Amino acid sequence: MSRKILGILGVAAAALLLATPVQAQKSKDTLRIVINDMFGAIDPYNFPHDEAGSFYRTIYSNLLDFDEYHQKFVPSLAKSWKRVSNTVLEFDLRDDITFHNGNKFDADDVVETLNWLRDEKTKIRFKDRYDWTIPEKLGPHKIRITAKQPFSTDMSNLAYRFKILDGETMKSLSNMGDYGRTNPVATGPYKVVDFDANRGLVLEAVANHWDKTPYSRAPAKRVHGVPVPDRQTQVAKFLAGEIDLLRNVEPETAKELGGMGAVVNPTPAQNLLYVTLDAAGRSKNKIMTDERVRKAFIMAIPRDQIVKTFVPGGDTAEQPPGICFKRTVACKPDVGLYPYNPAEAKKLLIEAGYPNGVDLVLDVFAPSRQIAEAIAGEIRKVGFRTTVNPMTLGVYVKRRGDGEFTAFVGYYPTAAQPDMANLLDFFFGADRDYWKDQMIHDIAAKGNLEFDVEKRGQLYVPALNQINQKAYIYPVSELPLLFVSSKDVKVLNNPLSAAESRLGDYAWSDYKEVRPSK
């Protein structure tokens, strides 16, 4: 923790004991949550950002959901469905749902949403997640979705990725980028009542919401997402009683706040913290095209020490054997990572022609800066003269896509769709591919055609082994979400996801939780 934050903690400690705004806000049933990196839209398609996702996954609804605890698909906007063939699915929709603006939900909304997603003119990130569908209206509340070709994770994609928009609102907009900025209309248990880059985001629980199951709970009447990008200011506001819940807090800061009476809650998140190494030579610095240099980088990192010291909730964080977790569907690598061995790392650098070491810029999305600094400190010991370069999300995404990174630290919310097919698409798809390994691309394509999960898992084994053997990606750790809250607030386990936090999981301490039954 920085001395500045320590100073704030020391000066403001009394404020935690004296503050009354928290209790006052509870009486108003308004839960105030800090937003670390304010998003430009409440939109799952134009702004697919992890922190924004914790909000929009409770604002929007899918055709169906997947209950990870009971390993089954459950109804949402669709009350039933059937597989007609390996390319055709049919859905019967509920007829008692209205959007937050009062418009009735029907088949037209699904068709309008899916047609927009697959339109060549629609420019969004991760376009290939959505353009495989061909929707057809069979009746007012019945649709057919045909895939362009057999797609083994079609149901999973629909359950995790496809948020249905209001067709009437879509037709009224000349620019669909405005949907999440000016008209974030949806069908979820919370609705947007105010959205401003400075004031933040205010949501309100929908009265008499159509989904009465525990999957769509809204524990607080109102939720105010307050944008505060600076950690020092976040801590000060929390201690002054102006914020009820901090998200993604550094371990040392959480420990100090916990000692003052705050509630510290590490929550499994299955966010994959990783380092990508530019084996394809896309960046100007070509050092990572040499497999020996990549191995030296990895073998210089004492993973267990870094995870337990710098990763929030590191004592319980999963250290995955590859680019996927135990809960990830079809994840079965049988070749492990290169072990920590700094002496061997030095030797490999010398063999690669760098007896005097080598210069390296380690780029990082700003929230993971502390961990990147820890990694840099270790690899410097074996000869990597490393400069850490943190940046905002927008800059990070653009520079990554432009192929400017030699080595970079990032994290990916695998729980957004915990399937190996999704992870291979994320790392090796579009402009995110820093390896250009045709074998991995071929295996991913074969996996998309295999509907048997066990067989699909076996198909992926050579690809996962190749990633580890060639030292393409170093999976550092799970990155749990470390929440710090007042004693009036608690963080619940999500009723659908075993490793994801959403808005309906933040509740007052006296909230009575009801879990879904089998």
Question: What name fits each language-model region?
Answer:
Residues 67-68, 72, 159-218, 222-224, ...:
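Gly/Pro-rich hinge or "lid" segments in bacterial periplasmic/extracellular proteins
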Residues 37-53, 76-77, 103, 154-163, ...:
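A structural "hinge/loop" feature
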Residues 25-26, 82, 126-170, 194-196:
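Surface-exposed binding/hinge segments that line
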Residues 117, 134-137, 193-204, 226-284, ...:
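Extracellular/periplasmic solute-recognition and catalytic clefts
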Residues 190, 284, 315-351, 370:
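Structural transition elements
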